[in-house]
């Protein structure tokens, strides 16, 4: 077992601390590099000549913030962060459209779209500007590419598809006698639908009853978790933007009920979930930045750049949550387990 180092775990910052502060730091960093364009691009370029790069995220939560941080850091490493336009739709579809129109009007040379609705909105806004997605579960299900191997248009990116079956297996390791598992998601997000379909199949194969509830906002989420907590032995939460953004609401019910919660993102683990099987969203951002930089430098095109993925093998445990529930890490998971603890 090993502790999750701070450099690998932006999740060491809780939801209550992260979003606004991180957003301010990102904006400050973007402003700093914008005014230092000569230093970034060398004496042959003026700051105004740095290629405009648009970055849009769907909503403020830790997983998406981590991806944006990875994108900005990755672009800086490639000397391409001279003119970033960082935008947040705050979960509003009409705002996504406005942001897409903004990027097109400002003649952005590259667009990064973080989360499935964001990449869909950017794909509707332009068929020519290269778009690189991050924190997108299925680009084919989102109908923005032809195939993962040969995207074929102006969209490519990296997938955040996590090991959904392994998330359920992790839950069963912690609650071996569980008969019914709960999950909550927004049916309006195709990324969530894809993951829930995988979770259903995994539950059926393992003889576990899956209790589902769909939500569209935090009010729905609170009602759903209060009702469902009385019927299930615990929860598995593959990544859903409404649920992740409202994890504090979920935990206000599950923690007093002493229920195990397994998440698909580190932000939810930091908020108080028991354990997680998750991709590294910061590294997703770094991967996306490399794809985008290669496209911007003319090394490849979005059409011919395959969708990137991450291989997730090891679970992460919230030390405090495990102790609160009186749980020990299963022996067969100890060797590769990562431990997270708020500092």
Task: Place the predicted regions along the sequence by residue.
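Short hydrophobic alpha-helices and adjacent helix-cap/hinge residues
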Residues: 2-4, 18-22, 27-31, 35-343
